[in-house]
Amino acid sequence: PWIGMFAQNTMWEWPEANVVILANTNLVETSLTWSRGMLDAQEAGTKFICLDPRFSPTAGKADQWVNLRAGTDPAFFLGMTKYILDEELYDREHVLAHTALPFLIDPETGLCLADVAEAVDPETGEPVEVKTFYMWDEATNAAVPHTTEGATPALEGEFTVNGKRYVTQFTRLREDMEPYTLEWTAETCDIPADVVADVATQ
């Protein structure tokens, strides 16, 4: 699952998704273009879940309506994220190969361990900075550039590089999500805890 601003794809790709969560939108009432895309995707088998404190026209057309308290959508997604992490509902291989979560960061500053080099933009001819990020290779037990072929990146853990402590972004994410339990989410959003778990599982 992908959560957050710009994590979603264009509506024309909705038919390829298993589930689409709609938050902060009432597209059935406000956008004929987007509502057409929603209906087409439903015909293709995509399930739509609508987060809305009221039973809006979009909630009425969705496959599932979650009537949470107004303004608590972020809390709902935080609770979902923690549940997904705790239950390991993510695609581990995809996360390792296609996200920045294995990258090493300084836990004090939140900045990635990286080398910065000067390069020239081939299109503009202007100088640009190129960053090479580091991850922990379990095969060599050392920090290596994220572009290293054949490396076995660690997804989680704490490591020492040049005498300094680093953790993976995944480790930091798990730590940051620790307070957002199902119980906290249920109380904040005024919905049953099993609703949060159900949506996260889907």
Predicted regions and their residues:
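Cofactor-binding loop segments of dinucleotide-utilizing enzymes, especially the Rossmann-like FAD-
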Residues: 25, 51-53, 70
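Glycine/threonine-rich flexible loop motifs
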Residues: 27-36
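Solvent-exposed alpha-helices and their adjacent loops that cap or buttress functional pockets
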Residues: 12-15, 41-42, 58-59
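Anionic-ligand anchoring segments at beta-strand to alpha-helix junctions in alpha/beta enzyme folds, i.e.
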Residues: 1-16
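Short acidic, glycine-rich surface-loop motifs adjacent to enzyme active sites
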Residues: 17-28
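Long, well-ordered, tryptophan-enriched scaffold segments
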Residues: 56-202
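A short helix->loop->beta-strand "cap" motif at the edges of active sites that frequently abuts
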Residues: 40-48
